[in-house]
Amino acid sequence: ALAAVLGLGPKVHPGGSSMGGHISLSWAAAHPEEVASLWLLDSGGIWSGPTSELAATIQRTGVNMLVASNEEEFHRLFQFAMSKPPPMTDGMLDVLAQDRIRNHDLELRIFAQVRGDHLEDRIRGLRVPALIVWGREDRAIHVGTADVLHALLPDSRVVVLDGIGHLPMIEAPGRVVADYLALRDGLH
């Protein structure tokens, strides 16, 4: 009933990237009657996929390349997350860096919490139309995880984008939006 309480209508179209995908999947598992479709971009929460570079690095060194406590770590994160980072001014990068640095401790706590969430058990067989988008060059969550997620969601379709990393909506926004609009158009 959350969608109705928020005035969003009887059914919504949640979507998200990485951790946002994990959150969208969690909501869909808890409230499938409220979900018209899912849009999942390099979604987190699927732990049985192939080991990613990020997972191997965390296991080997304890360093999570997706969090930043200073500007140097943010620039490393920015390069790690994307295969084709868009051009940005120094001012834009500074704003993004300060936001991530400010949230460093919170992000570490959230990563620890979601790591213990066994989402796969809750979404197996979920009958919701879903578009699964993945960057083939994703170093944070292995592209093979898209196939695992697809097997869990029988009404899903997978789009893998060559030359794209963990953030396809930033690296290839035109293609990502076109695929999403096609999903929505196909629901009517």
Model-derived segments and their meaning:
Residues 155-188:
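Catalytic active-site module of serine/aspartate enzymes centered on a nucleophile-bearing elbow/loop
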Residues 14-16, 41:
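Short beta-strand immediately N-terminal to the catalytic nucleophile in serine-hydrolase-like folds
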Residues 25-30, 34-69:
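Flexible "cap/lid" loop of the alpha/beta hydrolase fold
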Residues 16, 20, 24:
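Gly/Ala-rich beta-loop-alpha elbow adjacent to hydrolase catalytic centers
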Residues 1-11:
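Conserved acidic catalytic loop of the alpha/beta-hydrolase fold
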Residues 139-145:
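Conserved alpha/beta-hydrolase "acid-adjacent" motif
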